[in-house]
């Protein structure tokens, strides 16, 4: 049975608060885990949600602000204590390696696994990861530092004729028939887009059109638009405008400012424009399929 879901480890913004943890999510695709951002303390929520650490091999960091990456060292430490031996891959801005590799070498003299950094260009969209079931693309955003979102695209599943091997078929006349001609589409692929942090930025619309779920930052209320513009963040209403323009199926708001004791009014602001909107919350598990 297919599984494609998002686990929310943290949905707060930069200022630590008791109500929210800092930004981090886990995409669970058929039991394989992929982390998006790793704010301070993400390893605590990871364990609290009973996620399997041996299933997490790939981490995607949107940008180098502390509330999105300071948890990396703590996560590596947890993996060491739990006896990890499998390599850990981190996909991020090119500066990530020079910032974190010296710390990893200093604190972990004999690391039992490799931390492999995969840099990407944050100024353009591109494919940065692919395996048998998933493709991950970058979505350039507009923030105070180079920032990207991520598009997680499940590969479509095909069913083959039981009498055919999984490969090309050769007829008696030595004509090769592509395996795609011997299969049929069993399910359409699902897509999840993560966009945080960014100002209102219409350039992302073509990259996220029609996604099954869009996570878009909603740091501020529309009454604080001046502050949002100053800090290169978005309001809940602006997130809903992006969702509507991109014709997404569902919108999830997050990256909430600590100034608001309750985000319900942010939800109402967004739902006036895009009704199928929800608020992210810690330890939420949201199926995409």
UniProtKB/Swiss-Prot annotation:
The keyword rRNA processing does not apply. It comes from the Bacteria. Zn(2+) 2 binds at residues 67-68, 197, 255. Binds 2 Zn(2+) ions. One of its GO terms (molecular function) is 3'-tRNA processing endoribonuclease activity. Belongs to the RNase Z family. Homodimer. This is Ribonuclease Z. The gene is rnz.
